[in-house]
Amino acid sequence: MPNFASKTFAVLLGTACLVAPSVSMGSSFQVSCSDEAAETISDGMALLHNMMYIQAEERFNIAANMEPDCAMAQWGIALSNFHPLWPGTPSEAEMKRGQAAATQLATMTPGSAIESDMIAAASAFYAPGIEGYRARLASWANAQIETGAHHPDSVDAAAFAALARIAVAPRGPGRIQVLSDVGDTLDALHAK
């Protein structure tokens, strides 16, 4: 069995690279927006999967400007403004931008069941009445893991569910089993 450090590295690398630019979001699920906006969202999704949140937000903003009614553009903005594995918490400006996107999402109609579930997961982070970053992260993680379970054939949903499991994994010895399980899940996705 690999040691803890190598297993942790493998899981994080697998999560970051699961949906690389060569495997676009469009191959996992179709976005209910114009082709041009969908392509830009796919670029943003690839950046999100590689934890390039600042660059991803730029792509999602471009898509939102192209097509203001595209819910997945706002989803991307909301998701880009918290960073589950980065140290620290979102800045006040990031929280404001993410909350504004989540507020906008509440007025929009998703185009499919998976869009609805992905939007619900991102919005769970910004839900009213949740105090503190760890509680917000747990709210998002629970919803994101559920989304992954509801859409087992979606590489994107599975990758974000894996990220969610890592983000809320317990500290200490229990973390090893979570990381191992996530690694097994990602290995199975790569085998498809």
Residue ranges and their predicted role:
Residues 2-12:
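Bacterial N-terminal signal peptides that target proteins for export
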Residues 19-21:
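N-terminal signal peptide c-region/cleavage motif recognized by signal peptidases
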Residues 24-153, 158-192:
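Short coil/linker segments at helix-helix boundaries
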